[in-house]
Amino acid sequence: MPEYRSRTSTAGRNMAGARALWRATGMKDGDFHKPIIAIANSFTQFVPGHVHLKDLGQLVAREIEQVGGVAKEFNTIAVDDGIAMGHDGMLYSLPSREIIADAVEYMVNAHCADALVCISNCDKITPGMLMAALRLNIPVVFVSGGPMEAGKTKLSEHKLDLVDAMVVAADDSASDEKVAAFERSACPTCGSCSGMFTANSMNCLTEALGLSLPGNGTTLATHADREALFRRAGRLIVELCHRWYGGEDPSALPRGIATQAAFANAMTLDIAMGGSTNTILHLLAAAQEAEVDFDLTHIDALSRRVPQLCKVAPNTPKYHIEDVHRAGGVFGILGELDRAGLLETTVPTVHSASLADALERWDVVRSDNDTLHTFFKAGPAGIPTQEAFSQATRWPTLDVDRAEGCIRSLQHAYSLEGGLAVLRGNLAVDGCVVKTAGVDESIHVFEGPARVYESQDAAVAGILADEVQPGEVVVIRYEGPKGGPGMQEMLYPTSYLKSKGLGKQCALLTDGRFSGGTSGLSIGHVSPEAASGGVIGLVEDGDRIRIDIPARRIDLLLDEAVLAQRRSDADARGWKPRAPRPRKVTSALKAYALLATSADKGAVRNTALLGD
C-alpha cells in the first residue's frame, strides 16, 4: 500500500526537529499517524469572488479534523481580471495561473502533504489549482466560492452583470444617472461574476471532470446551501485518503478521475453551455499536466457534434448562473447530454463510483427526490452583501422546461452545433477559437478588410475615435502569451464595438484572448501568435480576411508570393510590432514570455527548453 507522504517528515527519530516544528503548529502525539491534508485557499480582499473565503478554509479544516485528518491551510494569490482589465495589469493575469500552480506544488511538496482541498473561484485560480492537482496526483477535492447574484436596477427589466456596466459606460447616449445605476447594481454580492464567464465556466467544468461535488459550479456564493458543499468536501477528502493510502484505489486520485474520457465530457459540457473560450486554454493546459492526450483536434471534433443546450449571459440577457442552478445545474445539462448519447458515463468522480451513478442521483429530470429538487430551488435574495451563506431564498418551482427553459433537450436545442468552435486556415495554421454561442447567425460567414492594431491599447483608442468602420475585421496582434506578454483579454475592445453599434457589423481577430464576458464575432487564440512568426503578424490594413464558421475556416486572402515577401521583412524586423508600444515589461513578465507556448498548447511553459 502507498505510505502517507507526510511520514517523510513525521516518522522516525531523525525527524524530531520536523516534528518539533509540527508541534508548534498545534499537532499532538496522536496526530502524527493521520493524513496531513493541505487546504489551498485563495482569500483576498481584492476580488469579489474571493472576498468571502477568509473563514471557509477553517470550516473545511474542522470537518477534516472531525473525521481523522490533520488540516493545514495556506493561501495563493488571486488576480481579478475585471479590475486588471484595460490596462497593463492584464499582462499579469494569465501568468498568475502558472504562479498559482507552482505555489500549490511548492507548498504541498515542501511539506509532504498527503491530500489537497482546493478553495478556488475566479478566472485563473481554478485553472491554476487544477494544473497543480493533476501535476501532484494526490487525492483532491475542489470547492469554489460560488457565483455572484445577478444585478438589477429600476432602470431596466433585465438582470445585469459586469459586462452591462462596461457597455453602458462607453455608450455616449447613456446618461450619467444610468451609468451610475448600472455601476452600483451590476455586481451586488460576493462571488464570481454572474454570467457564464470564465470563472463560472471553469467551476462548472470541475463538476464534469469529476473533481468537485454537484452544485459546485452553480450554487450561489450567498446561499446557505453552499456551506454544505464545504463541509462535505472536508469529509470527502479524508475518505479519498483512506481509499488511496489504505486501499490503493486509483479512482481516488485526480489522474484516475480526470482521464481522456473525463476531459472529453468536460469539453462536451463546455460546448453545450456556451462557456468561455478561456476554458479551452485551461483544459489544454490541465490535460498536459495530467499527461492526457487531449488537444485542439479533439475539441474541434467535439464542437462539430455537440449541440448548444444552454444559453446564459453574455450570450443572452435572459439567463444567468442562478437560472442554470434552478434548471438543475451542471447535472441538468449533463443529463440532457447523456440522453443524447454524448457522454462517457463509466468514468469515476470524487463522489460517485461512476458518472452514470451520479446522474441517477443528481439529474432533476430523472430523479423525483424532494431533497434534490429543494437543493436546486436555491435562488438569489437580491440583498447586496459580501457574506457567504447569508441567505436561504428558494424559487417556488424548478425550471424543468426542456423545450423553452434555460436548459434544453436535444430536440429543442438552441443550436445543433455547440457554443464553441475551432477555426483553421492560413491565418491560423495551428488553430483559433470562437464562442459561436455569442455570434449572430447573420455573420457566421464574414469577409472584410483588415484594420490592424499592434496592441489592445491602440485598438481601444481607435475604436473610441471611430476609426473602425462597419464591415471591417479588427486585428489586434502581439498580444499572445509571448508577444504581450501574458495574452491579455480583449473585453474592452469588444464592449466598445458594441457601444458603437458595431457588434454585429465587425469582426475582431487576435492572438490574445477574450473574457468570458465577450460576445460577438470575436476570434482569439490565433496560433501561431505574431511574436512566434504567425501569419497574423503579416496582415496589413485593407487586406481581406474571410471567416467561415460553418466550414471552420479563417483565411487571409493574399497570394503566397506576397506573404513570402512580408515574412522576409518580418524576419528582418525580428517579429516585433511595427509601431513602438509604451509598455513596461518587467523581468517577471519576461521570464514568463521566455518559456510561453502559443494558445494551441494551452499557453503553458515549453518544458523542452528546461531540459531533463
Curated annotation (Swiss-Prot):
Cellular component aspect of the GO annotation: cytosol
InterPro entries membership: Dihydro-acid_dehy_C (IPR042096), DihydroxyA_deHydtase (IPR004404), DiOHA_6PGluconate_deHydtase_CS (IPR020558), ILV_EDD_C (IPR056740), ILV_EDD_N (IPR000581), IlvD/EDD_N (IPR037237)
This protein's pathway: Amino-acid biosynthesis; L-isoleucine biosynthesis; L-isoleucine from 2-oxobutanoate: step 3/4; Amino-acid biosynthesis; L-valine biosynthesis; L-valine from pyruvate: step 3/4
Residues the record lists as binding Mg(2+): D81, D123, K124, E489
Enzyme class: lyase
Keywords from the UniProt entry: 2Fe-2S, Amino-acid biosynthesis, Branched-chain amino acid biosynthesis, Iron, Iron-sulfur, Lyase, Magnesium, Metal-binding
Cofactor: [2Fe-2S] cluster; Mg(2+)
PANTHER family given in the database record: D-XYLONATE DEHYDRATASE, D-XYLONATE DEHYDRATASE YAGF-RELATED
Family of this protein: Belongs to the IlvD/Edd family.
HAMAP family, A to Z: IlvD
Protein name (database record): Dihydroxy-acid dehydratase
